[in-house]
Amino acid sequence: MARYCGPKNRVARRFGANIFGRSRNPLLKKPHPPGQHGMQRKKKSDYGLQLEEKQKLKACYGMIMEKQLVKAFKEVIHKQGNVAQMFLERFECRLDNMVYRMGFAKTIFAAQQLVAHGHILVNGRRVDRRSFFLRPGMQISLKEKSKRLQSVKDALESKDESSLPSYISLDKTGFKGELLVSPEQDQIEAQLPLPINISVVCEFLSHRT
């Protein structure tokens, strides 16, 4: 699966937030946007604003690819209900993101690596597809060997269980967690490192699908 391999600190500086949860906040050293004249920004057009919101969403979920974004939108656009919520749920309930939310990894990129390298089980079966969509009642756990990974132990030890969203549960000693219910839009937005106008993103994609 394709993945973003560019400078992640530059992306964080662009949006003015430590969106990837790195221990070394890139904004402490360079708080201004990237570029020679980073502080000088022209007023954005409506298209520019829509594009920026889309880029923020992609960044918040680990620099997901454009075709994954479009595919997720196509999956929900004709369904009954709140399209914006269903669209956002497609990313919040991705396996890599749930591994990150539950605290098995300190960053979304570390979570992606755990999944891709086959360390993660879903309902007892190995799943190495990062975009795998979890449904309520599905349980995430680690392979027996993977429980000995120091990076996982450190991540779980530093995870504050009081910060867990109400739609997931975590059993640190058992190295497992569960998606309890489908998250609501406001619950998901509360977990994002920066505000995103999801309706604007949906409007942007509706003209391109």
Swiss-Prot record:
PANTHER family: 30S 40S RIBOSOMAL PROTEIN, SMALL RIBOSOMAL SUBUNIT PROTEIN US4M. Pfam families: Ribosomal_S4, S4. Belongs to the universal ribosomal protein uS4 family. Residues 23-46 are annotated as: Disordered. One of its GO terms (cellular component) is small ribosomal subunit. InterPro entries: Ribosomal_uS4, Ribosomal_uS4_bac-type, Ribosomal_uS4_N, S4_RNA-bd, S4_RNA-bd_sf. One of its GO terms (molecular function) is structural constituent of ribosome. It comes from the Bacteria. PROSITE patterns: S4 (PS50889). One of the primary rRNA binding proteins, it binds directly to 16S rRNA where it nucleates assembly of the body of the 30S subunit. With S5 and S12 plays an important role in translational accuracy. One of its GO terms (biological process) is ribosomal small subunit biogenesis. This is Small ribosomal subunit protein uS4. Keywords: Ribonucleoprotein, Ribosomal protein, RNA-binding, rRNA-binding. Signal peptide: none annotated. Part of the 30S ribosomal subunit. Contacts protein S5. The interaction surface between S4 and S5 is involved in control of translational fidelity.
